[in-house]
């Protein structure tokens, strides 16, 4: 199995996630076993994967431990009826929203947010004490089950997180503490097969997950070395890892390798190979690392013989279209400066 490893799949994807999805589909077309695996908790990973028609080939580390990889919604809970009929609560619907205030007699106890106007898809429920202080939040998976609850302390600081299976069993607990004004993870407890595993950091949990996941010569294809390079560096050498560099490897300041690729070049022997996008980069890196490991050039996707749907001779003059995410490293400011110079 090829595990295409990333951090998170969200509603709006970057070029890295787009490359992962394209690779997954290409592998599937050629009968190569593969899955996209993400390490961050995201209760809507299944929903977003479904938008790309890959929902059966995507899961997260949390899906793995929560026993929810193949989970499909089986029934729809009527929350409004449950609160009104079974719990005898009083509901007040918040105007111009999908939100509901919930009262136990006269006391305000819960605030629920739904993703739809029909109040079918529950997103979260906040719980309040008798002083109207928020003390707990429950977050629901897009498939309908309670995925995570957060116990809140002073100033709504997270004290404890519980992660659940679709059957309601707690499988992961995370404890937090205020360290120098920053809410910091101090302990992770994993309940697995009637045993408990203890971790001090999220990276330790991810490392344990990858050791459990990869069996029988399974291979990892790493697309996020900056975020996961330290995890991979401590991974058992028996697990082959291919790393993909989605950008140039040299710093623009002339200080050598870019900081977010240093974990790769500082741990070269940990990797089976490096994949880059151009032949020139392939040659440069091979020379730089003195051919210690293979460097492979796989060009990025492109469209040949594109048929224009418009008459290019009739296009409007003095207009430029720029397609990029609105982030600093896309050099949007440089593009704006170019336009300013053209029009002044």
Model-derived segments and spans:
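Active-site proximal beta-strand in glycosyltransferases
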Residues: 221-224, 233-252
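A conserved nucleotide-sugar
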Residues: 332, 336-344
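N-terminal subdomain of nucleotide-sugar transferases
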Residues: 1-88, 125, 147-149, 155-161
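A short, active-site helix/loop in glycosyltransferases that binds the activated sugar's phosphate group
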Residues: 262-295
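Short N-terminal targeting/anchoring amphipathic segment
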Residues: 197-203, 207-227
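Acidic anion/phosphate-binding donor-loop and adjacent secondary structure
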Residues: 252-256, 301-317
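Membrane-proximal helix-turn-helix segments that form the acceptor-binding/catalytic region
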Residues: 207-215, 248-274
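Conserved donor-binding/catalytic core segment of Leloir-type glycosyltransferases
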Residues: 311-330, 339
């Amino acid at each position: 199995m090829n595990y295409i490893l990333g951090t998170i799949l969200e509603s709006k994807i970057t070029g890295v996630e787009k490359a992962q999805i394209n690779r997954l589909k290409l592998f599937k077309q050629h009968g190569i076993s593969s899955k996209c695996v993400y390490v961050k908790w995201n209760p809507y990973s299944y929903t977003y994967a479904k938008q790309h028609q890959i929902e059966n080939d995507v899961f997260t580390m949390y899906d793995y431990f929560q026993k929810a990889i193949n989970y499909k919604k089986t029934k729809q809970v009527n929350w409004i009826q449950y609160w009104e009929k079974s719990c005898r609560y009083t509901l007040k619907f918040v105007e111009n929203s999908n939100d509901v205030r919930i009262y136990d007699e006269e006391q305000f106890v819960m605030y629920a947010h739904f993703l739809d106007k029909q109040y079918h898809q529950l997103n979260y429920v906040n719980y309040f004490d008798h002083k109207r202080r928020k003390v707990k939040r429950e977050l629901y998976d897009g498939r309908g089950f309670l995925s995570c609850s957060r116990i809140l302390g002073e100033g709504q600081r997270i004290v404890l997180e519980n992660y659940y299976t679709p059957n309601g069993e707690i499988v992961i607990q995370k404890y937090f503490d205020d360290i120098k004004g920053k809410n910091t993870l101090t302990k992770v407890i994993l309940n697995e097969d009637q045993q408990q595993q203890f971790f001090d950091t999220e990276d330790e949990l991810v490392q344990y997950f990858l050791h459990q996941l990869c069996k029988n010569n399974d291979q990892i294809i790493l697309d996020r070395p900056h975020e996961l390079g330290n995890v991979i560096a401590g991974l058992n050498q028996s697990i082959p890892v291919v790393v993909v560099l989605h950008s140039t490897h040299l710093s623009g300041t002339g200080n050598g390798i870019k900081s977010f690729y240093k974990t790769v070049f500082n741990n070269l022997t940990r990797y089976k190979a490096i994949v880059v996008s151009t032949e020139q980069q392939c040659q440069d890196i091979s020379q730089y690392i003195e051919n210690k490991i293979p460097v492979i050039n796989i060009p990025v996707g492109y469209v040949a013989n594109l048929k224009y749907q418009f008459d290019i001779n009739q296009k409007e003059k003095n207009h430029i279209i720029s397609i990029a995410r609105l982030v600093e490293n896309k050099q949007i400011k440089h593009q704006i400066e170019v336009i300013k110079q053209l029009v002044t």
